[in-house]
UniProtKB/Swiss-Prot annotation:
One of its GO terms (molecular function) is DNA binding. Disulfide bonds: none annotated. This is DNA-directed RNA polymerase subunit Rpo5. Keywords: Cytoplasm, DNA-directed RNA polymerase, Nucleotidyltransferase, Transcription, Transferase. GO terms for biological process: DNA-templated transcription; transcription by RNA polymerase II; transcription elongation by RNA polymerase I; tRNA transcription by RNA polymerase III. The lineage of its organism: Archaea, Thermoproteota, Thermoprotei, Sulfolobales, Sulfolobaceae. It is found in: Cytoplasm. Its EC number is 2.7.7.6. It comes from the Archaea. DNA-dependent RNA polymerase (RNAP) catalyzes the transcription of DNA into RNA using the four ribonucleoside triphosphates as substrates. GO terms for cellular component: cytoplasm; DNA-directed RNA polymerase complex. Part of the 13-subunit RNA polymerase. It is an enzyme of class 2 (transferase).
Amino acid sequence: MRSSSKKKIDISNHELVPKHEILQLEEAYKLVKELGIKPEQLPWIRASDPVAKSIGAKPGDIIKITRKSPFTGESVTYRYVITG
């Protein structure tokens, strides 16, 4: 007989999921000032995204995403967390 309890899987440990981290307020401020933009002008990620949920991201946060790249070694992008 199967158990009805659901297992929680940490998808952030999968090799194809890049590292996601929430920027501290001062880091986020420095980033948008350096880029000369408003946070909302960054590409968006929904708070309901599985990785955003797993790291506890809330609307208004900025997430730094670090991907491994065979060409550059590392590629860094940023996402603004929106409701949804």
